[in-house]
């Protein structure tokens, strides 16, 4: 024991020398003065300063911290008492924590092996569970009424570094057998809390469960973090015997006894930007086709859906979050939903977001509950205490949550995410726990229509089957349809076949994103930012000429670009952009009020106005601008109009109308007669509004679907079951931008009759 005391004294002198010499020009002495002035009881020592003073001492502190924690605490306490004798009461001491680089002792919960037991480690992860803060008795004081004496007893468990562990027997009688009365007011306690820390989702091994480590925090470290926080905890890794099994069975549970907890920002895993990277980003942002370039670079294995890919790019960039002085929180994250027929690559788009976004968590509607997405109150298996456990949306704070099969979720569970999508917090009031957790994440959901496939004769709201209170929280809602077009089907089949034939030079299959990941492993600053042309991957783009060949960014550079634009660019609205947003919002409201065809996919509310602002800000981020211009608002409105009003049909109709007008003008200039379309032509020689050919029976599939949708919406809106062909012709030509001829109307109605959707007799159409 004397040798132990001598060693402790030597270690204490070593730390006193460190504080006296104070590498860093008085940093630690000033820190001790601030600690005394602010009534704090913990001093953080930097490992770099300790290494500069005594390299051997720093190594021994990391390898055998149990021998040095108490001497370090005694040394700091002595210095504090010299500065202010009244700072510490009798028996009190200043605690010591460590920070700085730990070399290979900086690990994740997955890397904690048995070789680290008994050493000091720095573990980084995300807090998933927090127990309640409980008092732990340090010294009990008892009074004997017979003798009038006081008796005190100290308690130390195996987690303590000061002295040896003591027994937990609570005294009820003194040595003479006299009864003792506990003086609770004179007893001393310390706060105690247990945390569960899990490895961060983006760094966890694919296909494996994330590892978790229990952390014990005491005194001033309690309540310094909450579920969902990313932390770096420095502590001693120890093995403790279980309460039920003990040390006889040889089964121990391991815990991390913390001495310092540091909150990490969300940029802990940020990529490193070189000067060449910044130069290339500026060049990309100055291009006129930056939006199309990023959209085409996202998930090149998915054919088409360019507008949806553009929206996903804006979603990952996000707007600017605002916290006003009056406490109002304006979210900057963008929420998006895709509803459509099966096999239109909705789930594949979600997987693409998982690969590109810096932080993304994936879940499904049927496999998720409301508490699993938000937060839950659970019971500790050993102590029975209540603890707060974070859900998927809390863990994805500052990230993206991908929810597939959104329509399969129960209504009760779906209501739980209403607060997250607008207020971006999770409020829990259960089992005596009332807490509010941050869930500042974007939500991208995919769902199937209520009838399995999308019915064009019904309004979008009836197809989706979700309440308006939830739909209005989505900034964008895309209707993804499986259109039967022979030309498009041919292109999709060729694209899918090329994906399956995409192989390496040696004949083995390889990842579609091989180029991107190869660039990630290459640390060359001059690495190419564009994916090299590959016939199997890019098809026959080169045959169409270099100008039409679509450039695609590598995965590595796309990640860097999105991360840089999202976190380092904070645009602000200009007066011109604000006026244009207000005018556009008024036009959208007016258009939705006068819509006779059932409106668009989303209700136009005040949330739509905020959506325009967020989308415009995201587009300004993409262009690396610090101001939102009118052009950004125009680009945002294009995406919003596409999502709400299916602009793909309108653009096609406008194109066909222009072609028809050009044909009519050419025939008029040539002196042709009978070139006007009066709706009663039947010769088949008149110029018609078709994609290919010139006869009335060659009507495009999109025009047929648009006709059926207009007819179905008119029937539902007016509650009628029959109309004359003349009335139908007038109605569709009044609602459509490109008119239909009489022969086209009759041709489409005959197709609907063959499909048993209508019945035609004597010029009257009865809706079945």
Swiss-Prot record:
Pfam families referenced in this protein's UniProt entry, alphabetically: MCM, MCM_lid, MCM_N, MCM_OB, WH_MCM3_C
Motif Arginine finger mapped to chain: 472-475
Location in the cell: Nucleus
Keyword Cell cycle (UniProt): yes
Gene3D superfamilies: 2.20.28.10, mini-chromosome maintenance (MCM) complex, chain A, domain 1 (3.30.1640.10), Nucleic acid-binding proteins (2.40.50.140), P-loop containing nucleotide triphosphate hydrolases (3.40.50.300)
GO cellular component, one term: MCM complex
Domain MCM stretches: 290-497
GO biological process: DNA strand elongation involved in DNA replication; double-strand break repair via break-induced replication; mitotic DNA replication initiation
InterPro entries: AAA+_ATPase, MCM, Mcm3, MCM_CS, MCM_dom, MCM_lid, MCM_N, MCM_OB
Ligand binding (ATP): 340-347
Entry's Gene Ontology molecular function annotations: ATP binding; ATP hydrolysis activity; helicase activity; single-stranded DNA binding
Region named Disordered: 662-687
Residue spans of biased composition, Gly residues class: 672-682
UniProt entry keywords in alphabetical sequence: ATP-binding, Cell cycle, DNA replication, DNA-binding, Helicase, Hydrolase, Nucleotide-binding, Nucleus
Catalysed reactions, as listed in the record: ATP + H2O = ADP + phosphate + H(+)
Location, primary (coarse class): nucleus
EC number: 3.6.4.12
Main enzyme class: hydrolase
Protein purpose: Acts as a factor that allows the DNA to undergo a single round of replication per cell cycle. Required for DNA replication and cell proliferation. May act as a component of the MCM complex which is the putative replicative helicase of the replication licensing system in eukaryotic cells.
PANTHER family: DNA REPLICATION LICENSING FACTOR MCM FAMILY MEMBER, DNA REPLICATION LICENSING FACTOR MCM3-RELATED
Family per record: Belongs to the MCM family.
Protein name per Swiss-Prot or TrEMBL: DNA replication licensing factor MCM3 homolog 1
Gene name of this polypeptide: ROA1
